[in-house]
């Protein structure tokens, strides 16, 4: 991440898993509500990408946030928005829920 805070880190499964296990990052699932309810990374909160795009200042993110979607594309857009809003440590989960599921890692169901 640059000193000016104009970029985010794009990390894959093993690095993301370590960050989540460390407990210092907020995990934000930007998928649609029906996708989130069907299964999500334990502890992830759902903030749909369209909500972020419609009202960026209306959504609060922690200083250390991991964004996740199905494969890492929608979450990259959310990551760009978070950087623009001044979030200091932004991480995009490249591979997303698809990689998490395929690795057999636990998922929570419901909201």
Predicted regions and their residues:
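Rhodanese-like catalytic fold shared by cysteine-dependent sulfurtransferases
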Residues: 1-26, 33-65, 73-111
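Short, surface-exposed ligand- or partner-binding patches at beta-edge/loop junctions that are enriched
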Residues: 68
